[in-house]
């Protein structure tokens, strides 16, 4: 095939992640002939990465609480998620031979825990349904005639599709495929796109050399993080450049907006959130004897070395000596350690992204109003959510909605 040849197909799905594969499944079940294109050598690279530590498919909390996790985008995502609910997602997984269970936190996982068995079963089903795959096909926009342009190992390729589903992801983990190159091509078509920003991301902190050399990679367990009126219990991890982890990610949206506007923001960490300031002061008032201060804190309050190191960092920043603080002041500090965040970690290290195609650019069928026949699903759209199964649920659900939208479009 020369570059002037155009391959004509029914439906092109661009992006072989959860949203794209789900759109392909819906389309194939509806009788459409589907080709899935992806720049990577194989499907769902980021999905597989997400499943390495346990594939959190969705969450079991009541649907109203679940939907509220999407914040400003809730109203626009309600129809899609109400049509493909967390219960529907669990039933879908079980139909693929991968039953699920609810963890202690309410999160839902496949019993196999990993993503690979589910993905293998899914790809096998899609192949049986007649879906074809074209890997190492990097989409580069449209030509003057509206044909899809791809760069492949064999050179440029043009594809004319009756309908297209774009499911190229956001801008996180670019090495796994979602590099956000699509932003420029859609912006050139007049599509309004909210700037992409890292979501569920760690933050930079100017740790002292002593602290980061000693405590890089150390967890802070059983803590509570607070910012404004929000407080989250969980864990965090000290990194060489700052702090990350589930509790940090839960507050990252609000923290990100302030740090991007003001250049810094203060996060407070409670190291012993189950104890009041008075209870802490009482325990700290016990004579220390000949113990080192760190040993005293370890025995009196079960503070880990990294927690004590964090207190030292805070005291030094205030120009004070930690061991010289009166029990009442130290008790207050232990449950309100101020950490100054100076920026987000790079988008490449973020779990997901905020921003994307604004919802006013699509109709109720997830079709771009300016580009009839072109539908969008997944993280390309302007929404964000915390970890806990909300990201995958919305990706799956918008994939279903886009697939259904294409079927209606082709049927009309």
Walk through the language-model features, giving the residues of each:
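Glycine-rich loop(s) and the adjacent beta-strand/alpha-helix scaffold that form part
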Residues: 163-207
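A conserved FAD-binding loop/helix module that cradles the flavin
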Residues: 172-185, 189, 382-411
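N-terminal Rossmann-like FAD-binding beta1-loop-alpha1 element of flavoenzymes
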Residues: 10-36, 402-407
């Amino acid at each position: 095939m020369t570059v002037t040849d155009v391959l004509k197909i029914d439906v092109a799905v661009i992006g072989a992640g959860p949203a794209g594969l789900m759109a392909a499944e819906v389309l194939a079940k509806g009788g459409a002939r589907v080709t899935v294109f992806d720049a990577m050598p194989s499907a769902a690279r980021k999905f597989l990465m997400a499943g390495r530590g346990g594939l959190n498919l969705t969450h079991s909390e009541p649907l109203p609480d679940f939907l509220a996790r999407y914040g400003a985008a809730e109203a626009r995502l309600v129809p899609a998620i109400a049509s493909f609910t967390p219960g529907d997602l669990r039933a879908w997984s079980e139909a693929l031979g991968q039953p699920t269970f609810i963890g202690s936190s309410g999160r839902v996982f496949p019993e196999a825990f990993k993503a690979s068995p589910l993905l293998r079963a899914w790809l096998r089903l899609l192949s049986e349904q007649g879906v074809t795959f074209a890997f190492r096909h990097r989409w580069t926009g449209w030509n003057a005639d509206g044909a899809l342009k791809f760069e492949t190992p064999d050179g440029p390729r043009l594809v004319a599709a009756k309908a297209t589903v774009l499911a190229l992801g956001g801008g996180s983990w670019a090495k796994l495929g979602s590099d956000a190159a699509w932003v420029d091509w859609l912006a050139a078509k007049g599509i309004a796109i909210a700037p992409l920003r890292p979501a569920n991301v760690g933050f930079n902190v100017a740790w002292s050399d002593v602290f980061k050399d000693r405590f890089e990679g150390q967890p802070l367990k059983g803590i509570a993080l607070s910012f404004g009126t929000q407080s989250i219990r969980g864990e965090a991890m000290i990194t060489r450049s700052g702090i990350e982890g589930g509790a940090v990610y839960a507050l990252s949206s609000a923290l990100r907006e302030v740090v991007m506007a003001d250049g810094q923001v203060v996060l407070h960490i409670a190291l012993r959130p189950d104890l009041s300031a008075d209870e802490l002061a009482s325990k700290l008032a016990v004579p220390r004897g000949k113990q080192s201060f760190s040993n005293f804190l370890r025995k009196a309050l079960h503070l880990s070395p990294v927690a004590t190191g964090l207190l030292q960092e805070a005291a030094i920043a205030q120009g004070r000596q930690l061991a010289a603080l009166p029990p009442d002041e130290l008790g207050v500090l232990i449950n309100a350690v101020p950490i100054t965040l100076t920026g987000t970690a790079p988008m490449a290290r973020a779990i997901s992204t905020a921003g994307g195609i604004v919802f006013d650019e699509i109709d109720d069928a997830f079709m771009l109003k300016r580009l009839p026949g072109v539908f969008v699903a997944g993280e390309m759209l302007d929404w964000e959510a915390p970890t806990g199964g909300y990201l995958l649920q919305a990706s799956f659900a918008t994939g279903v909605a886009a697939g259904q939208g294409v079927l209606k479009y082709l049927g009309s």
